[in-house]
Amino acid sequence: MPRPLYLSPDRLFPSDPAQRDIARRLYKAVAGLPIVSPHGHTDPAWFAGDAPFGNAAELLLHPDHYVFRMLYSQGVSLDALGIGNADADPRESWRLFAENYHLFRATPSRMWMDWVFAEVFGFDVQLSAETSDLYYDRITEALAIDAFRPRALFDRFGIEVIATTESPLDSLDHHAVIRAANASGEWGGRVITAYRPDPVVDPEFEGFRDNLARFSNLSGEDAFSYSGYLAAHRKRRAFFASMGATSTDHGHPSAATADLSETQAEALFARVTGEDMSAADAELFRAHMLTVMAGMSLDDGLVMQIHPGAFRNHNPWLFANHGRDKGADIPTATDYVHALRPLLGRYGNEADLTIILFTLDETSYARELAPLAGHYPALKLGPAWWFHDSPEGMRRFRSQMTETAGFYNTVGFNDDTRAFLSIPARHDVARRIDCGFLAQLVSEHRLEEWEAAELAADLSYNLAKASYKL
């Protein structure tokens, strides 16, 4: 017999009764605030074309590497799940997911998925092998209804703005369609882009030289000369800003920065675009370009995000057979104090510059990141990221960052996801965790409740909107 699906109204709140009561009051005031999603990876084609999602597997399984990496770890092949395999039967892929749903117990993925099942699709029984077809049929049938098209869900979720992430090589045609729909009054949803230049900044990115050729064509600049390469970035950044972008994003293997002279930079650029590049050259070029990008952000006002410290594509077989972003990226230990000093030495004192720094290395929270953000005017701390975007990860972030950096050197929450339907669930988790953390401070007489109420609104909405210039 299927087991009931029940979302407790007190989920994630403190178990202490007094703190739980405070958390309830704080949460009640922020639960319905609009969602500001300033960084993520949803597909702008969804909102441009507003075509129906095809089926349950296509919507909830295929885009979510949090889900399929867990299944893969238990021996379920990506081909069987339909990841990059158009011949896979989506119902059978969904059944594999349902049969293995127990693997997600106590994970954030389980919490997000259960929210989607209950709140979006109205299920009151848990997903299992027994209920697999019930789920698949009800979800797939719902997706054929206009109320479940991308734009309708965007509005239903209370999303005020969402940022997607594109490379400089993207034409942004989908964003142009969305902006035209906004201008005509056809749809009011605000979907903006963000400038992620990794394919033309990382010399070890696959197809780097071909990417530079495309970069030249798109910008009208000679991206194989250092001066033309920088001019191409400025042009593409301006184009992205004209399409709504307020931020850039940089996903580097490390947080290394460098501040080279023009002569040094030109010589290095010649090496990384030539035949004699070393791994050290590639790392130095990435490091130098972070500093260059910070300077451009100071000039054009785009907020700069740095997401360092992931060992990308750790599984060579998986990368060769399925490509990137398939759940095989692994956190690494990351230095920030020494690595960021060249960039911060040049631009860290600029109060008009905003650099939002993320980490996958929790050991750096209190030792490095909080002291850095608690000093440099340009530096802010992004929320608990990726593997730490979880109830316990959020609690660790707040407990280790707040005493040194405070709340106002952080930037609220961002969901950073490809899984569109999980966005409200992720924001709800963050709001609940923050209200619980604040409730503890109130109960310990470290905050007044009215201060906690102001903070709850700031952490849920105001800080993200202000930090990302939205």
From Swiss-Prot:
Transmembrane segments: none
One MF term in the entry's GO annotations: glucuronate isomerase activity
E.C. designation(s): 5.3.1.12
Sorted UniProt keywords: Isomerase
Family matches, as Gene3D superfamilies: Metal-dependent hydrolases (3.20.20.140), uronate isomerase, domain 2, chain A (1.10.2020.10)
Keyword Metal-binding in annotation: no
GO terms (BP aspect): D-galacturonate catabolic process; D-glucuronate catabolic process
Catalytic activity: D-glucuronate = D-fructuronate; aldehydo-D-galacturonate = keto-D-tagaturonate
Enzymatic class: isomerase
Keyword Isomerase: yes
Cross-referenced Pfam families: UxaC
Associated pathway: Carbohydrate metabolism; pentose and glucuronate interconversion
Family per similarity comment: Belongs to the metallo-dependent hydrolases superfamily. Uronate isomerase family.
Protein name: Uronate isomerase
Organism: Sphingopyxis alaskensis (strain DSM 13593 / LMG 18877 / RB2256) (Sphingomonas alaskensis)
Gene designation: uxaC
